[in-house]
Amino acid sequence: MLNVAQVVAQNDWQNPVVFQRNRINAHSPHHGYKTLKDALHNTNAQKRSLNGQWDFRLFEAPANVPESLLSKTLSDDESANWQPIAVPSNWQLQGHDKPIYCNVKYPFAVNPPVVPSENPTGCYRTTFNVTKDELKQRNHIVFEGVNSAFHLWCNGEYVGYSQDSRLPAEFDLSGYLVEGENRLAVMVIRWSDGSYLEDQDMWWLSGIFRDVNLVTKPQHHIQDVFVTPSLGACITY
């Protein structure tokens, strides 16, 4: 288990060798349904949206994030510093930090893979419920888009890390969940070494900016679907 201080010490967001921890490998984005009727009506009871109002607090740098991010409850003084934020959204257009537009220049000094030590860090907290029957299955959480890197905890236990702002990040929560209420904590870092690859004529906006879903799957399920083509006899090269 890694706490906040330990993930800050690892400094994964400036390590070009590390771009994920415990993230499930990318796979085809197919959907599973319990019955043919559900499939025909596109009714997916196995996929639950976690979008909505989350608790949010912005810090000037990862090193400033307190261990209380992982606490089950916050003190009255700490709670006063947290505000509701819409997920999905970006924090700059929710009244936190400033958006930056760049064409060909970077928004920080160029020294890859180093990014500024004053690196705005958005912390998110939310809760959701899980039933006894759901605990018997595999429960994956899918972040469809987070800019630019993030660490994830569930019920105070470290789950993993991901960067790559425009691709989904999926983690298996099965070993971390309990029956009843569960809590998530997410630490989003604005700048990472991946930011060097993502800069070109764009607005820099940060946070959990795409959907978050909890996907419940049978213990045995189809994880990936792919096609391996072959050349016909009439094709030469």
Over which residues does each language-model region extend?
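Contiguous beta-strand segments within globular domains
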Residues: 229-237
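Terminal leader/tail segments of proteins
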Residues: 2-3
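Short Gly/aromatic-enriched secondary-structure transition segments
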Residues: 65-87
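Mature N-terminal segment immediately following signal peptide/propeptide cleavage
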Residues: 45-57
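Generic detector of ordered secondary-structure context
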Residues: 46-49, 74, 120, 204
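N-terminal glycine-rich cofactor-binding segment
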Residues: 99-113
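Beta-propeller folds
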Residues: 36, 48, 62-63, 71, ...
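Accessory beta-strand-rich segments of carbohydrate-active enzymes
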Residues: 6-24, 29-32, 36-41, 55-61, ...
